[in-house]
Amino acid sequence: MKRFIAMLLMLCSALLMTAAFAEEAAPEAKITVVEQRFINMEDDGRGFFFAKVQNTGDAAGYVDYKGNIVASDAEGNIILTENYVSTAPDEVYLEPGEYAYVCENIYDDALDTAEVADCKFSIRAADDGEEYEKLASEAKIHYEPDEEDDNYVDVTFTNTTDEILYDYEIVAALYDQNGELLFINTEVVSGIGVHPGSTITVRLYIYEDILMYFCREGLTPTTVDALVYCEK
């Protein structure tokens, strides 16, 4: 009887270990911040936050809409926090290896007197979200720093779906010659239909204060990565 009980306990233990291992090994999405930039506009109470996030997990998933920014000064004092920071578009679905961009305008009086020296951004995967279809596109930069109103990115794409597209979002990320993320702009277009097979070009401008920041810091955008999303 004792031997039977001992064998039963060993069997139960083995089953529990197998279940625990299976649960631990279950594939899941993991959202990783691979690049980011915080721009503190001087004496303006404004800032810009840009990031590239990637699904580095082994399963597809959505990006949570509750990302968190924590910005600190040179002494490590927290200047500001921002919650509910999401991708563009919101709660996007990513397969393993796929990426999306984050573009957040920040308004906070603390930026009038304090300068951001360090910025930490965290965002998780979620079980629910939105699914979009991505359309192939081409993008070109027009950059003339001496001309304040003549700096932009043209993004061209073709409607390869079977329906007229009335709602779509364009995201353009600018990089320098070293592959450093400099700036992201987005454009949500609604109510202008693109017929199946038709091609359209959307212009996204580089803000004047971003241009001044580039000139002040000696930065030059040389390449652009554009993503075009439409609702499924």
Feature map (PLM): residue ranges:
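Sec-dependent signal peptide cleavage junction
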Residues: L15-A29
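Terminal connector regions
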Residues: Y107-Y152, Y207-K232
